Each structure stands twice: as C-alpha cells, then as structure tokens.
C-alpha cells in the first residue's frame, strides 16, 4: 500500500496503536481498538431525488437501492431516518456504510474538515457521532464540483463505529486521529 494513499492507516499502525497499547495497558496488541465502519446518512427528505446521488459522490461508492422488506426496525434518532408516528423506520435505503478503502478515504476528509470547522461531536462507548453541514462541500473539490446536487441537502449525519469497549478508549482513538491531522497542518 502506498503511504500517501492511506496516511491515517499508517498513522494508526505506526503511532496511534502503539500509544493506545501503552496508555490502556493491554496485554495483547490485538485488543487495541480500531475503526470498524462509518455510517453516513443525508439530512434530507426521502423525496429529494438527488439524495442518493449526493451519497454516492460524498462517499465515493455506488449505492444499491434496497427494497422494502416489510419489516420494521427501531430507529436511531441520530441517523435521521424517515420514521412513522411509532418511531419505526420506513426508509433504510438512505444510509451508506463505508468499510476498508472507502472508509479510509472518507476518514481523511472527515478529519480535515473536523479540525477546520470545529464541529461538535458525541462520543459514546463504541461510536463517534456528529453532523456535517453543507460547508463540508467547500473542503472537498469533488463535492464542490457538484454543488447543484448538494444545495437541497442540509448536510450529513455521520456515525463512526469502533471496536472500543469503553467511552475512554473511543475518545483516545478519535483524539489520536485528530492529532495526526493537526500535526500535518502546523
């Protein structure tokens, strides 16, 4: 793998993982928390036709349209899913889950934008949740080129899922990624 292509991956392997191993006093390097996936949901009404296209452009992957199964699932209110009066999800097709290379590329963008915009975030036991407003487009040339698609979208809700066991582990992991970005810009 090219180090320039995945700078956060190498930062995690070479610096952050070792730091977490020492600070959290793990006996086994495989216990050190990492990132599992990133879930991205547009803040838009399901009736907006460009919502799916906006997700494909921002996440860098083609989305498959999911058919309705007729089953209902309880919704995470943070994800902004389209819910009925009882709080059940009726449209699951709007979210995109990123893993692997797509997750790495998106995380590089996220860490850059988070340090520039100072967006508020919520750190939970195994996840980091925050909203990215449309200003996110200004920092991504590929998004800015398609502004007409994003003008009706109020932003994105993002959930980063980790393998951490506690909120403190998640906080250390996230702050390590942000320190990597801050170190490069100074």
From Swiss-Prot:
Q: Does the keyword Ribonucleoprotein apply?
A: yes
Task: Choose one Gene Ontology CC annotation of this protein and give it.
Answer: mitochondrion
GO annotations under biological process? Answer: translation
**A GO term, aspect molecular function:** RNA binding
**Tree of life domain:** Eukaryota
Q: Which Gene3D superfamilies match?
A: 3.30.1440.10
Q: What is its main location?
A: mitochondrion
Q: Which SUPFAM superfamilies does the record match to this protein?
A: RL5-like
Its keywords, alphabetically, are: Mitochondrion, Ribonucleoprotein, Ribosomal protein
Can the keyword Mitochondrion be found in this entry's annotation?
yes
Q: Where in the cell is it found?
A: Mitochondrion
Q: Which family does it belong to?
A: Belongs to the universal ribosomal protein uL5 family.
Q: Which PANTHER family match?
A: 60S RIBOSOMAL PROTEIN L11-RELATED (PTHR11994)
| Protein name per its UniProtKB record | Large ribosomal subunit protein uL5m
Q: Which organism is it from?
A: Solanum tuberosum
């Amino acid at each position: 793998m090219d180090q320039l292509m995945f700078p956060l991956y190498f930062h995690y392997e070479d610096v952050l993982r070792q730091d977490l191993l020492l600070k959290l006093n793990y006996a086994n390097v495989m216990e050190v928390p990492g990132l599992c996936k990133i879930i991205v949901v547009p803040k838009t009404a399901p009736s907006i036709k460009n919502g799916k296209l906006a997700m494909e452009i921002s996440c860098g992957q083609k989305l498959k349209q999911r058919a309705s199964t007729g089953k209902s699932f309880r919704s995470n209110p943070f994800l902004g899913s389209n819910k009925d009066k009882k709080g059940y999800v009726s449209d699951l097709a709007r979210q995109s889950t990123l893993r692997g290379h797509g997750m790495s590329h998106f995380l590089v963008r996220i860490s850059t934008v988070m340090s520039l915009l100072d967006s508020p975030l919520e750190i939970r036991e195994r996840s980091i949740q925050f909203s990215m407003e449309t200003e996110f487009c200004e920092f991504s040339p590929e998004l800015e080129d398609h502004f007409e698609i994003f003008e009706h979208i109020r932003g994105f809700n993002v959930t980063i899922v980790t393998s951490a066991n506690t909120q403190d582990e998640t906080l250390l992991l996230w702050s390590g990624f942000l320190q990597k970005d801050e170190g490069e810009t100074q």
